[in-house]
Amino acid sequence: MSIITDVYAREVLDSRGNPTLEVEVYTESGAFGRGMVPSGASTGEHEAVELRDGDKSRYLGLGTQKAVDNVNNIIAEAIIGYDVRDQQAIDRAMIALDGTPNKGKLGANAILGVSIAVARAAADYLEVPLYTYLGGFNTKVLPTPMMNIINGGSHSDAPIAFQEFMIMPVGAPTFKEGLRWGAEVFHALKKILKARGLVTAVGDEGGFAPKFEGTEDGVETILKAIEAAGYEAGENGIMIGFDCASSEFYDKERKVYDYTKFEGEGAAVRTSAEQIDYLEELVNKYPIITIEDGMDENDWEGWKALTERLGKRVQLVGDDFFVTNTEYLARGIKEGAANSILIKVNQIGTLTETFEAIEMAKEAGYTAVVSHRSGETEDSTIADIAVATNAGQIKTGSLSRTDRIAKYNQLLRIEDQLGEVAQYKGIKSFYNLKK
């Protein structure tokens, strides 16, 4: 009854109006699962391959018909007949079928769509929520959200190099309250921006993209919004985080962090050592709890030096640096680079490998932050993954745009369903920092 009888993929659109995949898996019993695949704007060079058609006459070359065909004609044939509950065997079969180290033959987008749909079909077959199926009876921790309320870098036209300015309601008693705090700060920020005559249009991830005078202007404005909403900045209230996305403005030839790429003439050009000094300056000045991709993805010496300098005080998250890959994470753990990993399911391509990366991080005392991509869909699987793994943190955008809110609303449902068992750890989510 739990045997897979059909697998079907179609091309749909993501939140940026670009094509992506939706995959459906059916079983003998009638149980059904559907998975949709996200897509990134700033991508790590070591990420698994997102297969695009390259036909410029269709969707500007971004079509996904090849990946759709790979699901319908190759993957389907290979996994029909499997028990839908055998997630690892199915994921491993797809990895073997692809046969490349970066899923470049079938496409990580094709493989991931199937992987998610299989898990959802299994949960449907067993008549349990997805987070329960994935995590078992010990599932209980609601993640502390990183809310990206200001977008810069590659996610907007704002003249700021850092890609994301985030708030984290670390002092909230529950996820529901934390979400409310974030929404109220978001609206307070909008009022402040309007009063300054700044644009309140939102970027890819639902955050504002105003023409600030620089990084510190952005942080100061967020602090004013926190105060205006009636909250305090700090461990008992709301803390701040950055995604620097440094690889986006790192000049490989000159080996410098060239802020002029986004901030224009007269902006800073920093060496690796100066970049670390600058980040430390910001940490000393503001209530910052997390910094993602503070150094370029290939600047291993810089990462180690940054971790040595700030690793006990601030969460240092590797995104482009680790690309949700256990091979890179293992090296980071061994060399003392970063203290946290960003988990993006489409960077690696299967749920099995995603869970392995989270497990490896936790065993090494690293935190794991489950994350969306800038090109998202209404699929809320990452909310279930965050709870299933008790990851403790989620990064899924701002407090606007349905593609972001879908994940927050799913977490509200899960918190309700868990009832008294639910835990929201807030500041305790940063278990590897010395407070």
From Swiss-Prot:
PANTHER family per the UniProt record, alphabetical: ENOLASE
Cofactor comment: Binds a second Mg(2+) ion via substrate during catalysis.
Q: Which Pfam families match?
A: Enolase_C, Enolase_N
Superkingdom per UniProt: Bacteria
Q: Which organism is this protein's natural source?
A: Streptococcus equi subsp. zooepidemicus (strain MGCS10565)
User: Could you confirm whether the keyword Transcription appears in this record?
Assistant: no
Q: Which NCBIfam families match?
A: eno
Task: Cite the active-site annotation.
Answer: 205, 344
Per its record, the protein catalyses: (2R)-2-phosphoglycerate = phosphoenolpyruvate + H2O
Residues that coordinate or bind (2R)-2-phosphoglycerate: 163, 344, 373-374, 395
Q: What job does the chain carry out?
A: Catalyzes the reversible conversion of 2-phosphoglycerate (2-PG) into phosphoenolpyruvate (PEP). It is essential for the degradation of carbohydrates via glycolysis.
Cellular component terms (Gene Ontology): cell surface; extracellular region; peptidoglycan-based cell wall; phosphopyruvate hydratase complex
Family assignment from sequence similarity: Belongs to the enolase family.
The record, for InterPro entries, names: Enolase, Enolase-like_C_sf, Enolase-like_N, Enolase_C, Enolase_CS, Enolase_N
UniProt entry keywords in alphabetical sequence:
Cytoplasm, Glycolysis, Lyase, Magnesium, Metal-binding, Secreted
Q: Which pathway, metabolic or otherwise, does it act in?
A: Carbohydrate degradation; glycolysis; pyruvate from D-glyceraldehyde 3-phosphate: step 4/5
| Subcellular locations according to the entry | Cytoplasm; Secreted; Cell surface
Q: What is this protein called?
A: Enolase
SUPFAM superfamilies assigned to the protein according to its UniProt record, in alphabetical order:
Enolase C-terminal domain-like, Enolase N-terminal domain-like
Could you cite one Gene Ontology molecular function of this protein? phosphopyruvate hydratase activity
EC no. given is 4.2.1.11
Q: What is its main location?
A: cytoplasm
User: What Gene Ontology terms for biological process does this UniProt record contain?
Assistant: glycolytic process
Q: Where does Mg(2+) bind?
A: 243, 292, 319
What cofactor does this chain's UniProt record say it requires? Mg(2+)
